[in-house]
Regions:
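N-terminal secretory targeting modules
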Residues: 2-8, 24-203, 378-383
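Alpha-helical cap/lid subdomain in secreted, periplasmic
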Residues: 6, 89, 249-383
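Bacterial N-terminal signal peptides
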Residues: 12-21
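Catalytic nucleophile-elbow at a beta strand-turn-alpha helix junction centered on a G-D-S/GDSL motif
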Residues: 201-225
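Residues at the starts of beta-strands that form the adenosine-phosphate
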Residues: 203, 235, 302-303
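Surface-exposed cleft-lining segments at the edges of enzyme active sites
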Residues: 210-215, 237-243, 269-282
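Intrinsically disordered, low-complexity acidic regions
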Residues: 213, 218, 234-237, 247-250, ...
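Short helix-loop-beta junction
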Residues: 225-238, 329
């Protein structure tokens, strides 16, 4: 019986590895025996549709979730603010990375929320997707096309594709997806990409505010977290929560569950300071130090980046920056290693052209942030 169980496990593993390759054959059989259909793969009108749950995905850090594409586990308690508990359904930072021999690719998705856009962020960024291809000559991911959406019932697009070219698909920033499917030619295969040249296979985890979340760029690939991932060739997890990144102790527990290569803490925008008259519960003096100490205790060897408040556009020196700089100096004096400090002066170009509203970055502002955060992560990882 033991050998039988081992054989069964091997067969299941092999079946999972070749699920797309065998789909055409399986769907032929399914015409005559519905019990032989491959779950999650359907061929209609000359397109083989593969459910996103079968595709290689990055940016999805937890399996014990309420919905498959959630960013946090179902067990998040009321000790974490309601904004986080609501926006955990957003798919910011999630992406599919694969290679296929199909000559055309189709994409269809159904958004989680009915609201597709904001007054300062278009539907293409809030609820759309975008596609990149890897250019072997330059060694860079190059933008291909944006999947735009105008109907809350869902959207679909198709593009030509060069077989064998690695593909990256970024999911929506300020919305989630109820359903996602990739369409390829009936006999095409889809495979996960190989190891990264950077050698970094564990994700860089970003925890922060609306700016980390992706507000307010034009499309998902322009969120600075996604840019950093492409530029440094590292996987990323985006735990930015608009208006809600306040470093509750429980959130440090959730971050510590992730087997990360680096943590980036960028929450000051949403936090207050007792020195400035803030109320209790959302301020740096109460929350920051217990949070970072617990994270380091749970993950002692993982580098941490402490980012100042990127308020070049919205104010000068503030009590929050002063506090975390003093905390950083104290931790270094205690002997902490692998701790990187990112000052706000590195983050922006120094004028308002990089924003949509004086605070939230547009695409240009996101590129400036990506250079700053990318530099800090590069230093933390020794790249």
């Amino acid at each position: 019986m033991a050998n039988g169980k081992k054989l069964a496990v091997r067969l299941v593993a092999c079946a999972a590895a070749v699920f797309v390759a065998g789909a055409a054959f399986a769907n032929d059989i399914a015409k005559y025996d519905k019990n032989m259909a491959v779950e999650g793969i359907v061929v209609t009108n000359g397109i083989k549709w593969v459910d996103g749950k079968l595709l290689p995905i990055e940016g999805r850090a937890f399996n014990d979730v309420e919905h498959y594409y959630d960013r946090l586990p179902a067990g998040v308690t009321t000790n974490v603010n309601g904004g986080v508990r609501s926006m955990k359904h957003h798919t910011s930072g999630m992406q599919f990375r694969f290679v296929t021999d199909s000559k055309k690719l189709s994409f269809k998705w159904v958004p989680y929320n009915q609201s597709l856009a904001m007054d300062h962020m278009p539907a293409s960024g809030v609820s759309g997707i975008d596609v990149y291809r890897f250019d072997a000559k330059s060694g860079r991911w190059l933008y291909v096309k944006t999947g735009r959406i105008t109907n809350a019932k869902g959207a679909q697009m198709q593009i030509p594709w060069t077989p064998g070219t690695p593909c990256l698909v970024n999911l929506p920033l300020y919305n989630g997806v109820k359903e996602f499917s990739l369409g390829v030619e009936p006999n095409a295969t889809v495979s996960a990409l190989g190891p990264r040249k950077s050698g970094i296979d564990k994700p860089v985890v970003f925890y922060g505010t609306s700016i980390t979340h992706g507000g307010c760029c034009s499309r998902p690939g322009m969120a600075f977290v996604n840019i950093v991932g492409r530029d440094l060739d590292v996987p990323v997890v985006n735990l930015g929560f608009s208006g809600s990144g306040v470093m509750e102790f429980e959130m440090s527990e959730h971050l510590a569950r992730i087997d990360a290569s680096c943590y980036v803490l960028d929450c000051l925008w949403n936090m207050g300071s007792l020195a400035s008259g803030a109320s209790k519960g959302r301020n740096v003096e109460e929350n920051y130090e217990p949070f970072i100490r617990n994270l380091r205790a749970k993950r002692p060897d993982v580098p941490i980046v402490m980012a100042e408040m990127c308020d070049v556009y919205c104010g000068g020196p503030n009590a929050k920056d002063k506090y975390i700089k003093q905390l950083y100096d104290k931790l270094v004096a205690e002997g902490w290693k692998n701790l990187v400090y990112l000052p706000k002066d590195d983050m922006y170009t120094g004028d308002l052209e990089g924003t949509v509203d004086g605070c939230h970055p547009n695409d240009w502002g996101m590129m400036s942030l990506a250079r700053a955060f990318g530099g800090a992560v590069r230093k933390a990882l020794g790249l």
